[in-house]
Amino acid sequence: MKALVILGFLFLSVAVQGKVFERCELARTLKKLGLDGYKGVSLANWLCLTKWESSYNTKATNYNPSSESTDYGIFQINSKWWCNDGKTPNAVDGCHVSCRELMENDIAKAVACAKHIVSEQGITAWVAWKSHCRDHDVSSYVEGCTL
């Protein structure tokens, strides 16, 4: 019985933690989901963005007190503009998706929303990209990855 309780807590901690992608694994996944070159944004730039936004973690969240909104998932997509978390005042829900879905281990919905965002606002919609990736050599983010 004790072993079952310990095993239950282990599974619970994995479910709460989410998936933290390995860099090349994420590169392959993003390429498969059509982000490489999407709207002129290279795969290396997407990897740089996700590294600085979430450290490749699907369950990452960040509360923004000034806007009373939260950033969700591997792309840190904001609940004020892009997803519905049921608690952000005057939310727009531009991607027509639940914020919870943006934190799934299967990142297809998060990628679809990121595509929508970059189509409307460009890659500069992400502050981390402007701070850490723009005007930098980002080639190291895909270096050594078998794509």
From Swiss-Prot:
What does the record say about tissue specificity? Answer: Stomach-specific.
Effect after changing Q17K: In isozyme 2C
- Reaction catalysis annotation: Hydrolysis of (1->4)-beta-linkages between N-acetylmuramic acid and N-acetyl-D-glucosamine residues in a peptidoglycan and between N-acetyl-D-glucosamine residues in chitodextrins
User: What positions does UniProt annotate as the active site of this protein?
Assistant: E53, D71
Q: Which domain of life is it from?
A: Eukaryota
Q: Which PANTHER family match?
A: LYSOZYME C
* Family designation: Belongs to the glycosyl hydrolase 22 family.
What else is noted? Lysozyme C is capable of both hydrolysis and transglycosylation; it also shows a slight esterase activity. It acts rapidly on both peptide-substituted and unsubstituted peptidoglycan, and slowly on chitin oligosaccharides.
As for what it does, the entry says: Lysozymes have primarily a bacteriolytic function; those in tissues and body fluids are associated with the monocyte-macrophage system and enhance the activity of immunoagents.
Q: What is this protein called?
A: Lysozyme C
Organism encoding this protein: Bos taurus
